[in-house]
């Protein structure tokens, strides 16, 4: 692990990293998040009886949109031309939660970790938003990077 923050310049100021001279490589990142809720809330989602419609479909699209907008949300992220964004949601009734996984890919000069994390986080937030009328104490947890490939720092996997 490096001991230097790449987004801090020699004067100690935040700046956007210059990737001009970096090579274009295939890059991929996977992230996850969980949202825990009451069994009744999860059953409402799973049965499709939620009055706001298909919660998973809405959360999936929100996660995809969020990945594409990451540089608008996180100030020092580069705008990226993503070639793939995938968001998967899996109800886990045995744990009263939804497991959210995201995948982002591109051919570029910088990684897609933040895009994958943003996709998973936003999908979880969307589930919360759609279900808050029936339950306000849902818990979003374990948002983390699972894997990244490509670039100078190589392969990382939890």
From Swiss-Prot:
Catalytic activity, reaction form: (8S)-3',8-cyclo-7,8-dihydroguanosine 5'-triphosphate = cyclic pyranopterin phosphate + diphosphate
CDD domains from the UniProt entry: MoaC_PE
Entry EC number(s): 4.6.1.17
Transmembrane feature ranges: none
Pfam families associated with the record: MoaC (PF01967)
Record GO biological process: Mo-molybdopterin cofactor biosynthetic process
Gene Ontology MF: a single term: GTP 3',8'-cyclase activity
Residues reported to bind substrate: 76-78, 114-115
Active-site positions on this chain: 129
Keyword Phosphoprotein: no
Key words of the record: Lyase, Molybdenum cofactor biosynthesis
Pathway membership, UniProt: Cofactor biosynthesis; molybdopterin biosynthesis
InterPro entries: MoaC, MoaC_bact/euk, MoaC_sf, MoCo_biosynth_MoaA/MoaC, Mopterin_CF_biosynth-C_dom
Family note: Belongs to the MoaC family.
Subunit: Homohexamer; trimer of dimers.
Free-text function comment from the UniProt entry: Catalyzes the conversion of (8S)-3',8-cyclo-7,8-dihydroguanosine 5'-triphosphate to cyclic pyranopterin monophosphate (cPMP).
Protein name: Cyclic pyranopterin monophosphate synthase
Species whose genome carries this gene: Shewanella piezotolerans (strain WP3 / JCM 13877)
Lineage of source species: Bacteria, Pseudomonadati, Pseudomonadota, Gammaproteobacteria, Alteromonadales
């Amino acid at each position: 692990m490096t001991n230097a923050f790449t987004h801090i310049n020699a004067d100690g100021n935040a700046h956007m990293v210059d990737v001009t001279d970096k090579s274009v490589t295939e890059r991929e990142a996977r992230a996850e998040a969980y949202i825990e809720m009451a069994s009744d809330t999860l059953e409402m989602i799973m049965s499709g009886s939620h009055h706001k419609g298909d919660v998973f479909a809405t959360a999936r699209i929100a996660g995809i949109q969020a990945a594409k907008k990451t540089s608008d949300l996180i100030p020092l992220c580069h705008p990226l031309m993503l070639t793939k964004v995938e968001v998967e949601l899996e109800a886990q009734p045995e744990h009263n939660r939804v497991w959210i996984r995201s995948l982002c890919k591109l051919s570029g000069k910088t990684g897609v970790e933040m895009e994958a994390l943003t996709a998973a986080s936003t999908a979880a937030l969307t589930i919360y938003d759609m279900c808050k009328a029936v339950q306000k104490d849902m818990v979003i947890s374990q948002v983390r990077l699972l894997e990244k490939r490509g670039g100078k720092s190589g392969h990382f996997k939890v």
